[in-house]
Amino acid sequence: HEVLVKNKSSKERKISAKKIMIAVGGKSSFPDFDGNLNMINSDEALDLNELPNSILIYGSGYIAVEFAGIFNGFGVETNLVFRSDYVLKGFDIDIRKKLTEQMVNRGIKIFPEVTIEKIESNDQFITSLSDSTKIFTDKVMGATGRVPNIELLGVKEIGVKIGKQGNIIVNEFNQTNIKSIYAIGDVTDRINLTPVAI
């Protein structure tokens, strides 16, 4: 089997292998609302040159919860906004309730059961929520999900089955419908955590 690889300067190279592993990950996906491009993603949050005085994080999954804890731990005024009633939707309800309670106890401001209507940029970012609340912060981070990074791979063209969310469909052995091609991590519909792909 051959793979055609292009480097940053568009130089092409063919690589041959018996089996091919796809582990290209995913990228942040933001909801569509006015000012959504004012948000930074988790990668950009790690590249900040200095800590903001305040941040709003939009989302309730493990990335949002992790970054809320990190920023709060560094003394940043942290606001966590999400649609569900508690953080970590899909996890055990007792864990979700206790974790949300502990986040509040540590000083994280929680705004459950709301969505962002718009983000305006002035001296600070002004985030308007669906319940008419306005939150003023130095940064706004989106952590509402990730989409597989497959658009440049050409996997559809060779017949690899793709799911509704744009993910590569794999079996319990991470094998695609093409027996010599495997996929792991955010590019699949399985558990999407960095350590799975490593």
Positions of predicted regions on the chain:
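Short loop/edge segments at beta-strand edges and connector loops
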Residues: V24, N41-D43, P112-V114, E120, ...
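FAD-site-proximal beta/loop scaffold in flavoenzymes
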Residues: L37-P52, I135-I198
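Short glycine-rich, flexible loops that bind phosphorylated cofactors or substrates
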Residues: S29-F30, A64, P148-I150
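Short hydrophobic core segments
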Residues: K14-G25, I57-Y58, T78, I135-G145, ...
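Glycine/serine-rich phosphate-binding loop and adjoining beta1-alpha1 elements at the start
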Residues: H1-N38
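Conserved beta-strand-loop-beta-strand element in the redox core of flavoprotein oxidoreductases
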Residues: H1-K14, E120-K134, V140
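Rossmann-like dinucleotide-binding cores of NAD(P)H-dependent redox enzymes
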Residues: L46-D47, P52-L56, Y62-I126, D131, ...
